[in-house]
Structures are given as C-alpha cells and as structure tokens.
Amino acid sequence: MIKRLVAFDFDGTLIDSPLPEYGKLVWSEKKGIPYPHSGWWSKPESLDIDVFDIKPNPVVYSQYLKEISTPNTYVIILTSRLKKLEEQIKLVLEQNNIFVNEINTKNTNETKGIRILKYLDKFPEINEISVFDDSIDVIENEYNTIKHLLPDNLSFNIYFVNNNKLTLVESKIIDIIRDELIKLI
C-alpha cells in the first residue's frame, strides 16, 4: 500500500541537464551544424545523450536512493518537460541507473501542484508528500497554492534544490506547530 509520494523535478533538480545557451553551442559544435531551433526545453536535442554527458546532481541523487528504497513509497519525476520528450527523459534516467515508478510530464496547462493532488485519488492512503524542485517560482505559485486543499493528517514537505543543496522550505507539519504555538501565546 502506497503511503508516501516523493516527486523530483527533472531539470536542475535530480538531473544536471544542459542550459540553453551552453547546450545550443555544444550541440552545434558536436553536430557540425547550427542548432536548428530557437527553443530549448521542448526540443529532443536538449537531452541528446550522444552529445551531452548528462549526470544527476549528487546530493539529490543520494536522496533519490534513500526514497526509492523506502517501503510504501511511490517515487515520480514531476517535470514541466512535454510528453513528447518522455523517451529522452527515460534514456537519461536509465543511463544514470535511475528508475522511478512514473514519469509525469506536462501535457496540459495543469500546474505541478494540481498534478500532485491527483495522486491523492490514485493512492488514498498517502499520508506524506515530499517534493524537490529548483524553481522558487514553482514552489511559491504551484506547490504552496495547494496546501489548503490537502487533508489535515497529511505531511507535505517542499525542498528547494540550489547549488546541489537541499533546503526544507515548507512543511505542513511546521505550519501546524507554528499555528498551535501562536494559540498558546
């Protein structure tokens, strides 16, 4: 029975994927032709394992190893990458011996927060959700906005990944303790 959901963002969180400016330059040099697109994140070239040696962020990878070995835990990749790139994402993960229960790509306008909520229907016994992301914007505008929609008995932990460090920035348990302390004062 699944009791925990752990969601890792892909780019810049679990995986140290190439950034657009550098990536386009390297891709052009290795292929011997100009990079053919103006965009980056929605293009399969951005995850071309024949061009890039794409590795995981070590601290986040260590956390992944801990989470994937924890019983009753469903580990997912929760990315803003499009569904059409799912095969490239799988290849990068497999190349790094990363195997998750699910890759959740963006295929609608739903935020990551809304996509997380859907797992409560899929696994009604979940009592803990932990998310790992490198975007403060996503944390503030997509995860924090769903806290009030979560059951009271559910622990919701948000970790910010920056410079290969994990920082717990939000926890529903911390909020409950803070509220109770305020009531006592």
Which positions does each model-derived feature cover?
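Conserved Lys-Pro-Asp/Glu-containing loop-to-beta segment of HAD-superfamily phosphomonoesterases
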Residues: R4, K112-E142
